[in-house]
Amino acid sequence: MDIIYNPVLGGVVEGEWPNVHRNYVPTLCMHCKNPECVPCCPTGASQQDPDGVVWVDYKKCMGCKVCVNACPYGMRDTSHMVRRFDEYVRKCTFCKERREMEPDKDPYCVQTCHQKARIFGDIDDPNSAISRLINRSDTFRLLEELGTDPQIYYIPALGGKR
């Protein structure tokens, strides 16, 4: 089973014929500061590292899907492992294993984005490029009203709306 870590919301259609365009919204794990998926895990497999990255320890995961149901963004899924017959939960980890080996490397989704629409960095550093972009007045976060404090920010497309 293939897992899609960055599904795209259908987008918002704007304009009138013949000047119609659609804005697409790629989604991924929001790596919330207050994730609902971490404290509910009965085995402690769902974790959050000191940098705020939410991840799953596959060795501890029993595939109960409690965290799948707890995620308000629907960004967790289960997958059959090749070497095991049971299921475990998978999700975007910002390529945690890769960044542990190569700390100066961005996650693959950032590295391979042809339009350079994805930016990864330290949002706690006020001088970082990502912090400067976040401080723009037009950025927004999905389902911010839930209180999970999502750490993925969106900048509307030029001329686009939220």
Regions found by a protein language model. Give the residues of each.
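Non-ligating segments of multi-cofactor redox enzymes
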Residues: 1-162
